[in-house]
Amino acid sequence: MKMIEGGVTAAQGFVAGGIHCGIRKNKSKPDLAMIYSEKPCAAAAVYTQNLVKGAPILVTRKNIADGAAKAVICNSGNANTCNADGVEKAQAMCDLAAQALGIEPQDVVVASTGVIGQVLPMEPIQAGIPELVKSLSAQGSHAAATAIMTTDTLPKEAAAEVEIGGKTVKVGGISKGSGMIHPNMATMLCFATTDCAISPAMLDKAIHQVTEKTFNMISIDVDTSTNDTFAILANGAAGNPEITAPGPDYDAFVQALEAVCRTLSKLMAGDGEGATKLLICQVDGAATLDMARTVAKSVICSTLFKAAMFGADANWGRVLCAIGYSGAAVDVNKIDVSFRSAKGQVDVCQKGAGIPFSEEEASLVLGEGEIEILIHLHMGQESAQAYGCDLTYDYVKINGDYRT
């Protein structure tokens, strides 16, 4: 398995595009994206855990209940959530996309992202979709990734390839999300594609398995959005024997999908609103996988810890505090904590107690743009990673001005 270029159009048979249709006032910000495969695709998706769900999720869930789709249509700048006519408009987006592509409306995945509670204007979408379809290309991943952005500062793309059944299988994806990001599918959209031949049931199994290890391990601000969707389409163009059961071929596919999603997870965490640092919390030596995940997420979610990282302050006590209230049955007297970056590693806690370290060295280590928090529980063999970012003054500024 290796990472490659190409994003969501790396896989054979997929095209994508993105344009500005007029939902957003700023003409320099694209706001309508599409992904399409002429070949029929197996389809699967996971959605937000928020009880308040955007209208597009309700429509998409219905459309791919049969495990099939051929296209994705997504707008940014408006969430189409908490609107009386939201479902009607989400369905209309599917109808318009299907008409322009010459496919059935039920073969369209629809998504929206932006401000909650504002009426979604359909006129620019209706006028823009024909132009969007004309723009579709096998080099359109970047345009699509840009068109789904909201407060993101950069488009997020990743792709990988792996050998399955003697064929080269490619998996690619794009994602957005820099605020309202918290474990259990937060304000993020991710659209993945693959030319792997895989049954809808196994594709669904894979997407759930990978989400638990990647997207559900991100937290930026402990807010869970209403519109989160991770959808994947598989058109089988690689020509591998169809994956219909667990085994080596399935494991190879999951490895590639996980690599793509982990890369996108890190890109989202590092692009958190106002963020200056990507934080990676690595927990080892847990008694169970659930313990490892719980501890990692608790630390990465700690507001006080995130603020300390912004200030390059090696306040390891905030790490232990977050572990303590996580609910995980750890033994505090066994916990080791270290910080690591490109500048080196500094050990700050052993067996639950502080040890002497150089504050100057620690500040250098924590001054880098990517920081690892290394936690060893010494209780077992399980491990987990969680991803987040520092908490800065700009986070408040961005969200204070979000609707203006």
Predicted features, each with a name:
Residues 1-88, 92, 98-404:
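A structural signal for small-residue-enriched, beta-sheet-centric alpha/beta enzyme cores
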